[in-house]
Curated annotation (Swiss-Prot):
CDD domains: GlmM. This is Phosphoglucosamine mutase. The gene is glmM. The active site is at 99 (phosphoserine intermediate). GO terms for cellular component: cytosol. It comes from the Bacteria. It comes from Campylobacter concisus (strain 13826).
């Protein structure tokens, strides 16, 4: 069975992600990282899910069994783990989170000593070790060679300083009213602290994690509460994080949820004006709206498109010497400050842009009007290779002929196919989506 998906290992806690699997995966990772070890220390963090305690304990057992020392830092955002792994000179970092998924799911993702997500070749090597009984048995240490673990509570300050350093020193957030929805997740302490220390009037919602309310009708996937609070409190802006705070959703002062591509476009144009956009280009994914292309062209900025997943965005950014990119879903990467999508860094850049431009959020983000786009997640029973589906090429050609951009791809973690259609005529896009849905229902026995 394949372990790694598009973002680490993910599944239902206690089922696919059991204590046994977690411990063995940690042992396999430990064996791999020992080959290039510099400090013999691995950092482990988690979000606020109840199952995080079980998985954390199993991971610590697995790592110490193969001789690694472990630093446990408790609930912290995913980008904090990436930053602290490098900052604290660890051999690797491990984050226990299923991001925006419900509380009963969990996941394990790894970072190398520089705070980068692992590429697929390394994941494949760890997976190979995971299934090698002899190698795992022989790697287990005894007596004084068994590793030690230490729980540390004071590292949050290092990450807060890093976030504040991404905000222009000549600015402050006095007279700015901000509503934060921390999704009962990993940002529940750090996000309010950062905004308060910079002088904002901060209102926080969904900040009482109990182990099972993470992402529950709140946060980046459910910004409705945030939108109504921003309006009710006459706030200047609202920010919603997901469970591990690597993505951000923005709500303007009118309570309108800002389109993810409008965030990317506006920030790219702002960086370009500030002469801070390297390479005169940004990276977005194949999911991004064609209106983003047109908006960036008007600002003389080039758009490169990667596969879906922030690690692929980052890969393309590195290959092309680009320092800004992201996904429509709210993963935004400022490579000057972070190695992965970071909701807090993004929120800092958004408020800095508002202050420097002297404009309201709605005025800035209203400049990019996305073309009608429909995304449908269709449950399926089998994942046939797309190039083997009869009639699909003809369907794509007929859509293109009508000026409709199409993208069909399987979810890396669930039995779903994601169907995306985009065009300038809403009615036509809706009509064709009905046909596309029926086509895939028949083709994949959904």
């Amino acid at each position: 069975m394949k372990l790694f998906g598009t973002d680490g290992v993910r599944g239902k806690a206690g089922e696919k992600l059991s204590a046994q699997t977690s411990m063995r995966l940690a042992m396999a990772a430990g064996i791999y990282f020992r080959k290039t070890s510099a400090t013999n220390v691995i950092l482990v963090g988690k979000d606020t899910r109840k199952s995080g305690y079980m998985i954390e304990t199993a991971i610590v057992a697995g790592l110490t069994a193969v001789g690694y020392n472990v630093l446990q830092i408790g609930p912290m955002p995913t980008p904090a783990i990436a930053f602290l792994t490098e900052n604290m000179r660890c051999d690797a970092g491990i984050m226990i989170s299923a991001s925006h998924n419900p509380y009963y799911d969990n996941g394990i993702k790894f970072f190398d000593s520089f705070g980068n997500k692992l590429d697929e070749t390394i994941e494949a090597e760890i997976e190979k070790i995971f299934y090698d009984d002899e190698l795992i048995a022989n790697a287990q240490k005894t007596m004084t060679e068994i590793g030690a673990n230490k729980r540390i509570d004071d590292v949050i300050g290092r990450y807060i300083v890093q976030i504040k350093n991404s905000f222009p020193k000549e600015l402050n957030l006095k007279n700015l009213r901000v509503v934060l929805d921390v999704a009962n997740g990993a940002a529940y302490k750090v996000a309010p602290t950062v905004f308060s220390e910079l002088g904002a009037d901060v209102i926080v919602i969904n900040n009482e994690p109990n182990g099972s309310n993470i992402n529950q009708n709140c946060g980046a996937l459910h910004p409705e509460d945030l939108a109504s609070e921003v309006k009710r409190l006459r706030a200047d802006i609202g920010f919603a994080f997901d469970g591990d705070a690597d993505r951000l959703v923005v709500v303007d002062e009118n309570g309108e949820v800002v389109h993810g591509d409008a965030i990317l476009g506006s920030l790219a144009a702002f960086l370009h004006e500030q002469k801070a956009l390297k390479g005169g280009a940004i990276v977005a994914t194949v999911m991004s709206n064609a209106a983003l292309d047109d908006y960036l062209k008007a600002h003389k900025i080039k758009l490169l498109r990667s596969n879906v997943g922030d690690k692929y965005v980052l890969e393309m950014m590195k290959e092309n010497g680009i320092n800004f990119g992201g996904e429509q879903s709210g993963h935004v990467i400022f490579n000057d400050y972070a190695k992965t999508g970071d909701g807090l860094v993004t929120s800092m850049q958004v408020v800095a842009m508002m202050l420097k431009k002297g404009k309201k959020a709605s005025e800035i983000f209203g400049e990019l009007k996305p073309y009608p786009q429909i995304l449908l997640n269709l449950k399926i029973t089998e994942k046939k290779p797309l190039d083997k589906i009869e009639g699909l090429k003809e369907l794509e050609a007929s859509l293109a002929k009508e000026g409709i951009r199409s993208l069909f791809r399987y979810s890396g973690t669930e039995n779903l196919i994601r169907l995306l259609l985009e065009g300038k005529n809403q009615t036509l896009v809706e009509k064709r989506m009905d046909e596309v849905e029926k086509f895939f229902v028949k083709a994949l026995n959904a």
